Amino acid sequence: MGKGVFINTGCHFQDQGGITLGDGTFLGNNVVLTTMNHDFDPEHRSTTYPAPIVTGKNVWIGSSVTIVPGVTIGDGAIVGAGSVVTKDVPPYTIVAGVPARVIRKFDPKTDHLPSTHKKTHEDK
């Protein structure tokens, strides 16, 4: 686990395949990281297949996201709340949905991402 990692409440880790969280990774509440899969064939379902989950630096994973075995999430990526991540996420990419799809890519040095802070009536 990297430095400055934040894990919110209700997260579940099934880690037989290994989980690596890069520096500054932020997990919203109720995130599920599962690193074990099994065969579809009923006769072979008792055979399990572990695969690691890896996040780069400064990754933000929204609330109630599920990440399946073998996924790598690149530096600075953002995963929208409620998403199911079944494929690798490139660095500096926003993904969301079931299954998660690319919403947009961004350059952290030049793109302005909107704040998640909602203004009140008193804010100007």
Sequence positions of predicted segments:
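Flexible, glycine/small-residue-enriched loop-and-beta-strand segment within the central core
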Residues: 1-72, 98-99, 104-116
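A generic "structured core" feature
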Residues: 6, 74, 78-80, 84, ...
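Short hydrophobic beta-strand segments in globular cytosolic domains
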Residues: 62, 68, 80, 85-86
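Acidic, glycine-centered active-site loop in nucleotide-sugar glycosyltransferases
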Residues: 90-91, 96-99
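Leloir-type glycosyltransferase catalytic cores
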Residues: 117-124
